[in-house]
């Protein structure tokens, strides 16, 4: 499926940490989904996991942008969308006037070649700003301290070595550059045994078919390269690399919800977060309904 303004992808080198089973499964999924789009189905129906959540991701990135502006770290310059998948994150970033270039890095070649162009066209991305990359987010073929923003949307929890991944982020980010991460995190009281139980769950038949895995094969979330972390484990990983990290958790009132929706709640919550940040507080609230999806804003110290 040709999209006129879509740039040819660049191919970056890959580390041994790239999960090959997940990579081949993602390629299989991409080919299936593109065939369904060609047959007449809407991309939103075919790949609802990321595409249907476009507005939510856009809102979360805008919250991060407002917060960064408040702490004098505006969203601008060169960005990397890590584990870009459908390209939704790169699409959102392309609409920020002060973002000049986005590297959309995804290790599934078929997602880069076939799915990203459809996503960019559907959501009216600024094609000129986005350079698609077939590559591994553990090895970015970029100079040291050359990037201003790194974006993660549900990708870092696939890292086989979070310490290694954050080392690479730290290498390419300029001083005072920032990571915006929208990712899954569990309450701190969760034990490692509890998290391991989640990872040992078998993929259902529909997912096995989608990813080209034989239905009768035993295949768990762990086998697919998933990992689970508590909020504090994420925070510790950032702090070990000298990032100053703020965490936003989603919250909504149980009553009078319609009244809340009439208020400028995004600006109210980001302003409150800024005031708490000045007082040394690093955990904040934002309006939302997904209790396990957190927004991390991590600024690299000089």
Predicted segment positions?
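N-terminal, positively charged/glycine-rich alpha-helical extensions of SAM-dependent methyltransferases
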Residues: 1-46
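Conserved alpha-helix/loop element of class I SAM-dependent methyltransferases that forms part
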Residues: 55-75
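Class I SAM-dependent methyltransferase SAM/SAH-binding core
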Residues: 86-139
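A short acidic, Gly/Pro-enriched loop at the edge of an enzyme's catalytic core
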Residues: 138-149
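A short glycine-rich, Lys/Arg-flanked "PGG" loop and its adjoining helix->strand segment in the class I
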Residues: 163-175
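Conserved class I S-adenosyl-L-methionine
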Residues: 180-208
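Acceptor-substrate binding/catalytic loop of class I
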Residues: 217-233
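A C-terminal cap/extension of S-adenosyl-L-methionine-dependent methyltransferases
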Residues: 232-236, 245-302
